[in-house]
Amino acid sequence: MTTEQGIVSLAGKVAVVTGAGSGIGAATATALAALGARVCCAGHNVENVERTAAEIRAAGGEAFGLRVDVASPEDNDEMVSETVARYGAVHIAHLNAGTGHWAGVLEYPLEEWDRTMAVNLRGVLLGLQAAGRAMRDVGGGSVVVTASAAGLTGGRMSSAYSASKHGVLGLVKSAALELGPIGIRVNAICPGFIASNDLMQQMGQELDLASRFPLRRPGRREEVADLVTFLASDRASFITGSVFTIDGGWLAGGIDLRDDSVDQATSDARVTALANTHSPNGDVRSPV
């Protein structure tokens, strides 16, 4: 709902957020709760999602943590059924969990390819199916999927991640066409480099990424959460099937992580090592 003053309110709404243990997911879960939603904080690391939920409760909100493997149909169904059992419905889903591995396309390990697709693409489909069925039961809802700027362009050493995020955008647009008539809106956000945790901030500093952005800084996870909460709310009631870039203007000039002080092979190796070091499995934001 929206207050008369135009301020977004999510009082009475129920949300599920995947990848809620840290980074963008934790920020979004916190922001949704601050606006009045009751939140299921889902993710692969139960300690992290329970910590996010505890912080929400300490601030006066309602939330619980749940371990969820987003690539598992059973886990997605449990996420939604447990949320409905506790709070009576699901109105909002932020499908945010993601992972990635950086390697050259000719040597890309198939097991890493399969894992990336399982989390980033299959996981979105399964979350959309489970949450969408619950939203259908209450007459509609809003699904917001975290894609990436890498879903709008290619990226060196990140073929699986980029391919998975391109696939996510196709899924979002197709789902919006199908689900619009039953009141379910589906949109995607495409973050650029977000300093979502200390390691990602360190990576940005090591690659001097701020100098590559028109705004001369990386994004903050709270800025992404603000976009998600808007799309989740009735303020965005006529928005569906859309893709929102939040990258500080990076894509306007083309993504390039190259270190110009060294040759291309050395630059690729450096970026790959940094990306894989700073991207723990399960709640990853790509450098692109």
Model features per residue range: what roles?
Residues 14, 21-23:
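Conserved glycine-rich cofactor-binding loop
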Residues 37-51:
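Conserved glycine-rich Rossmann-like NAD(P)H-binding loop of the short-chain dehydrogenase/reductase
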Residues 104-105, 112-114, 209:
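Substrate-binding pocket helix/loop in short-chain dehydrogenase/reductase
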Residues 128, 164, 172:
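Active-site helix of classical SDR
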Residues 133, 177-178, 237:
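Alpha-helical segment proximal to the catalytic Tyr-Lys
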Residues 148:
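Residue(s) in the substrate-gating loop at a strand-loop-helix junction
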Residues 188, 204, 208-239, 246-248, ...:
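C-terminal helical subdomain
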